[in-house]
Amino acid sequence: MGHFCYFQQIHFHSFAYSRLIGEIAISTPSRRNTLSPSRANDYMNCPLLYRFRVIDKLPEPPSADALKGTLVHAILEDLFGLDRLERTPDRAHDLLQPTWEQLKEKTSGVTEMFQNVDLEQWLISAHSLLDRYFELEDPKSFDPTDLEKFVEYQMEDGPMIHGYIDRLDIAPTGEIRIVDYKTGKSPKAAYEEKSLFQMRFYALILWRTLGKIPKRLQLLYLGDKNRLISEPTEAELVKTEGKILSIWSDIQLSYETGLWKPKKSKLCDWCAHQSICPEFGGTPPPLPVQVSD
């Protein structure tokens, strides 16, 4: 793990957060005036999906894969709450069942979710993800500075950008590392830049709020035991800032015109809104009268 260890606590504006429930409470002036990496990606992938999630706030059934990600994230967060010597594979596996029981109680639709999914195999695969985590790094060798950290920054002539960082490590030398866990497989080389957008989004916030560019961005892919590592430059973060402002400008135009165009792609296979999507012969519901706040 090198020299990254517990060094200091960065003080950002914090909010109540719960991975188990999957709910985020964000106290901001208006959802129209804020942007997270997830919502930015929604708009880039399909403006209509952004509308369904942000304006219409349509419910989406939970998926077994997403729930597994929530479970593993919660276990890793709890693991770092233990003393270093207790952060072992056996201890992580011991945490799985009680964490799953809590998650099951907090999540609606679990029974329906596992009608077509083998629960036993699903839990086995979650154990496998934990094993792969320990093959990627040794959590006994360092203490994180922050876990599930909410960060935000008000862009000039733009939105309040915000997000949750899975883990923030600060070295004794002051170098910052942003770490994000992914329970899926690592992207092919052609798609790495798209995956790094989220991490540069976070790095931009830290740079603008702290005046220091993070040294390393690290994505840990537990699905195939791979790392994606990047050392961001000022030029890359300035480019990311411009990209965010461009996305934001397009979103504002959609608000003004009421046009939220669907964009057909392979991602449509996982979309919960095909029945009301024009690309699949559906009709979206009327836009709410008030969409600005």
Task: Place the predicted regions along the sequence by residue.
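C-terminal, charged and often intrinsically disordered regions of DNA end-processing helicases
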Residues: 5-66, 293
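A non-catalytic, helix-rich entry segment at domain boundaries
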Residues: 16-18, 75-147
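Metal-dependent nuclease catalytic regions and adjoining charged, substrate-binding loops involved
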Residues: 34, 90-91, 173, 206-293
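Short, polar/flexible loop-turn hinges at active-site or ligand-entry regions and domain interfaces
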Residues: 56-65, 82-87, 188-189, 258-260
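Hydrophobic (often cysteine-bearing) scaffold residues that line and stabilize catalytic clefts
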Residues: 64, 68, 72, 122, ...
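Solvent-exposed, amphipathic alpha-helical segments
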Residues: 71-82, 250, 254
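Mg2+/Mn2+-dependent nuclease catalytic core
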Residues: 149-246
